[in-house]
Amino acid sequence: MLTNPTIETLKTLKLYGMLEALEEQQQTPAIQALTFEERFAALIDRERLHRDNQRRTRLLRGAHLKVAAASIEDINYKAARGLDKRQIAQLATGEWIRRTQNLLITGATGSGKTWIACALAQQTCRQGASVLYWRVPRLIEELRIAHGDGSYLKFLKTLSKAALIVLDDWALTALSNQDRADLLEILDDRVNTGSTLIASQLPVDKWHAYLGEPTLADAILDRIVHHSHRIELKIPGESMRRVRASADP
């Protein structure tokens, strides 16, 4: 039986996975057939699994995904919206994140952009990488506030640390020159250091006109369009929001 000092020591060291596994071993007579090394290896494996699960939970909570339940396993390929299953499978490996490449998802309202973006972001968290989700209108507002209260540089640093940033609702609202400059700062910080996933109703070839100021537009697009993967979604006849709502119990 585990003694109270042993239990307290494991708790003090925050070895909760090991403690749980050790208690299970104490309640399993057949475990005595294993060698000490085998039992100890099982404890270490459980502790590592426990920590991995905790990290994934923290990453998912910190990502603030709009659709937290979205997962690549539940992506609907039956709807005729231009999804390539092989492309999604490749993106799901996370190799594009490791190579600090970008992903641009475009399509009309209801085509499932946000859901797919969140599914890939969730997959990134499950693989142990950090994610931040932002709707661009809200991000712009937060940047304006940060300029006013002196937290701008700290905010930029926080954004730069994420392995993946999801910028949803790109090109939805008008931008000021300061907004454009802020977006350039964010994207420039991520060159060769992090990936950016952009979801937008507006086709990529119209982004330059949307951004407006030619010099800043060139600089912004240079940092996101090159070395990027693209998914262009089509409306399958019915909004994917309605399709999912009707499928819910």
Regions found by a protein language model. Give the residues of each.
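Short hinge/gating elements
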Residues: 5-8, 24-28, 74, 102, ...
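Charged, compositionally biased N-terminal leader segments and the immediate start
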Residues: 1-20
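Conserved P-loop
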Residues: 83-161, 211
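Interdomain "pre-motor" coupling segment immediately N-terminal to P-loop NTPase/helicase cores
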Residues: 16-68
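Walker B motif beta-strand of ABC-family P-loop ATPases
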Residues: 164
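Dynamic helix-loop-helix/coil hinge segments at AAA+ ATPase domain boundaries and subdomain interfaces
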Residues: 7-9, 61-84
